[in-house]
Amino acid sequence: MKKTAIALVVAGLAAASVAQAAPQENTFYAGVKAGQASFHDGLRALAREYKVGYHRNSFTYGVFGGYQILNQNNLGLAVELGYDDFGRAKGREKGKTVVKHTNHGTHLSLKGSYEVLEGLDVYGKAGVALVRSDYKLYNENSSTLKKLGEHHRARASGLFAVGAEYAVLPELAVRLEYQWLTRVGKYRPQDKPNTALNYNPWIGSINAGISYRFGQGAAPVVAAPEVVSKTFSLNSDVTFAFGKANLKPQAQATLDSIYGEMSQVKSAKVAVAGYTDRIGSDAFNVKLSQERADSVANYFVAKGVAADAISATGYGKANPVTGATCDQVKGRKALIACFAPDRRVEIAVNGTK
């Protein structure tokens, strides 16, 4: 009984800790991130065409905020709004920058997540970003790198990301994310405004971030199941013939009634204990009490109780309920009648409501 109660309490506490690790629904969060960006698809070809070197990697950073729409059964759904400096690519000639392409803008995306371990989510994001691309051209012959021209263009680009996020505390989470931005910018030379260069790179970046979740508070505590314990006592003279272990026909109605109550208990563990009176040898009484306990247990198994959820033990003449009441009684028939309360089968049922 005590072990069962302790186990249920521990299970309840474990469930509560899991709930505290996950973000709560209908709450907001905000964070910052930083990492490295890399330009791909078109940069190398453009550099070869104009016979310049290039730097594709740069520092990237951003801020983001989100609203947790759903978090149930390890599945989460949020909407995120952010602003990123997506990074920059540079064209280089003779050790000097001759062209620079920078990108920044806002983005909106849906974030779906799945909790793989307690407090650890993997996630994916898909959305759209409104990106402003700035192109700056420099005079490579000037030691001060005087700008010859500057041009910019805003364009919508697809944004996708995958990552992992860990809740250090219910209010604080860290994430590692790979993000890619598709077809960024569309440069048109100032002397040819109707002509666009075949240069629309996509930008991949790996970022580390940290976020604060608002309104988490104490997570809802999952209540431990209510412990249920029931005990039934059967008079052996009603259930069995004297000195026998076979169930009487009239015992069926009593056992069926007990089974009906037993079936209302969840995760039930059943212990059947058989007892005899003090008449006869110890060996005979232990054997008889065990057989009677087995008969009752087998009846319940036949009704549907799992065999591994029920036990049967015979205790012989142990634990008499008559005490010293029959010590002065004389005669076998009188003793048999007096000892009747000792001849019993007790059924203990423990589980949850």
UniProtKB/Swiss-Prot annotation:
Could you state one GO cellular component term attached to this entry?
cell outer membrane
- Keywords for the protein's UniProt record, in alphabetical order: Cell outer membrane, Disulfide bond, Ion transport, Membrane, Porin, Signal, Transmembrane, Transmembrane beta strand, Transport
Subcellular location(s) per record: Cell outer membrane
Record-level GO BP terms: monoatomic ion transmembrane transport
SUPFAM superfamilies linked: OMPA-like, OmpA-like
Disulphide bonds in the chain? 326-338
Q: Where is the signal peptide?
A: 1-21
The record's domain comment reads:
The extracellular loops are most variable in sequence, and in some bacteria confer sensitivity to phage and/or colicins.
The protein's assembly and partners: Monomer and homodimer.
Q: What does this protein do?
A: With TolR probably plays a role in maintaining the position of the peptidoglycan cell wall in the periplasm. Acts as a porin with low permeability that allows slow penetration of small solutes; an internal gate slows down solute passage.
Which miscellaneous remark does the UniProt record hold? Answer: Cross reacts with antisera againt E.coli OmpA.
The cross-references to HAMAP family, in alphabetical order and at most eight, read:
OmpA
- This chain's protein is named Outer membrane protein P5
Give the originating organism. Answer: Haemophilus influenzae (strain ATCC 51907 / DSM 11121 / KW20 / Rd)
